[in-house]
Regions:
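Surface-exposed extracellular loop regions of Gram-negative outer-membrane beta-barrel proteins
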Residues: 1-14
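Beta-sheet repeat architectures centered on beta-propellers
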Residues: 16-22, 27-31, 37-173
Length: 173
């Protein structure tokens, strides 16, 4: 606001933009993804003026994503490069492991270029996660509030409990 250099004041329009949690910033392919108030965004979209819809990768699951964001109070993420996946986890201290949620965004090659398909994770309580390669083997590790370090993508149980899984395809005409 103001009419001259002497009285000009720069004021924020909103603080409800940008990255919500630094632990959600990940390099995916040749772009950078992060959790924003309206969903998962691509950093490259900030360079494209007026590209508001394409910037929100999670737009196709917006109602589910809004519920995911409102239910959590701490978010972290990791990338599984071998599967082209961005995994986002919600952690609320003191809640049961069975109530913990996560979202997997998998980058797929579609007819119109790269697209993201989403799925939901339930029952993996993640406070911090990371992935890295050692001699062509990708390791995905995470920790939670119990003080232990766990390895994802290994085995067929989670700490001795069977992993429940449901697979559903889109409705076909």
């Amino acid at each position: 606001t103001g009419s001259t250099i002497a009285d000009y004041t720069l004021r924020p329009v909103t603080r409800d933009i940008g990255c919500l949690y630094g632990d959600t910033i990940q390099e995916v392919g040749t772009d950078v993804m992060f959790l924003a108030p309206d969903g998962i965004r691509l950093l490259s979209a900030t360079d494209r003026v007026g590209d508001f819809n394409l910037g929100v990768v999670s737009k196709v699951i917006q109602p589910e994503f809004a519920s995911f964001i409102s239910a959590g109070n701490h978010f972290t993420s990791t990338v599984i490069r071998g599967k082209s996946q961005y995994r986002l986890f919600s952690h609320t201290a003191g809640t049961a492991q069975s109530a913990s949620r996560g979202i997997i965004g998998a980058q797929l090659q579609g007819e119109e270029g790269a697209v993201f398909a989403f799925s939901e994770l339930v029952g993996i309580k993640v406070y911090s996660a990371d992935s890295y390669y050692i001699s062509d083997v990708e390791y995905v590790l995470f920790g939670n509030e119990d003080g232990y370090l766990y390895r994802m993508e290994s085995g067929n149980s989670f700490n001795g409990t069977n992993i429940a899984a449901i697979f559903a395809t889109p409705h076909m005409p």
